[in-house]
Amino acid sequence: MFLGTYTPKLDDKGRLTLPAKFREDLAGGLMVTKGQDHSLAVYPKEEFAARARKAAAVSRTNPEARAFIRNLAASADEQRPDGQGRITLSAAHRTYAGLTKECVVIGSVDFLEIWDAQAWAAYQEETEAAFSAAEDDVLGGLL
């Protein structure tokens, strides 16, 4: 399970060091793709494959489904962390997420998100008020 908030730096070659506690779960390979809200999503390879199969099962006659599948597949980049736990983020991914040197990696239960630090701070400020109010709507009283 991927939980927590981490603040690695992006180096001049576009490499990001993954949090040490997640490296074992990602050692077999991972997929980086566009995420929501101009973040990047990092999935263990098997999790990404399962999600891709579910997406592919949706009718391609639905224009929104086609667009989602195209964007998901076209932006996917397979990576394997190096010996220091680093992955290289493509220029296209760095541009999409507006990444600068200061990054934030957050755990989102079954995947990671990579954010530009300023974008993450702005997102948190924007959504903080709705966070507690959304618990019942999102979780439906499961907790």
Swiss-Prot record:
Pfam (any one):
MraZ
What InterPro entries is this protein classified in?
A: MraZ (IPR003444), MraZ_C (IPR035644), MraZ_dom (IPR020603), MraZ_N (IPR035642), MraZ_sf (IPR038619), SpoVT-AbrB_dom (IPR007159), SpoVT-AbrB_sf (IPR037914)
This protein's UniProt keywords: Cytoplasm, DNA-binding, Repeat, Transcription, Transcription regulation
Asked if the keyword Ubl conjugation belongs to this entry, the reply reads no
Matching PROSITE patterns: SPOVT_ABRB
What start-end ranges are recorded for coiled-coil regions in this protein? none
- Biological process annotations from GO: negative regulation of DNA-templated transcription initiation
Example GO CC term: the record gives: nucleoid
Q: Which GO terms describe its molecular function?
A: DNA-binding transcription factor activity; transcription cis-regulatory region binding
Domain annotation SpoVT-AbrB: ranges: 5-47, 76-119
Compartment(s): Cytoplasm, Nucleoid
Q: Where are the transmembrane segments?
A: none
SUPFAM superfamilies found in the cross-reference section: AbrB/MazE/MraZ-like
Q: Which family does it belong to?
A: Belongs to the MraZ family.
Q: How does it assemble?
A: Forms oligomers.
Name this protein carries in UniProt: Transcriptional regulator MraZ
Which organism is this protein's natural source?
A: Corynebacterium glutamicum (strain ATCC 13032 / DSM 20300 / JCM 1318 / BCRC 11384 / CCUG 27702 / LMG 3730 / NBRC 12168 / NCIMB 10025 / NRRL B-2784 / 534)
Q: Which gene encodes it?
A: mraZ
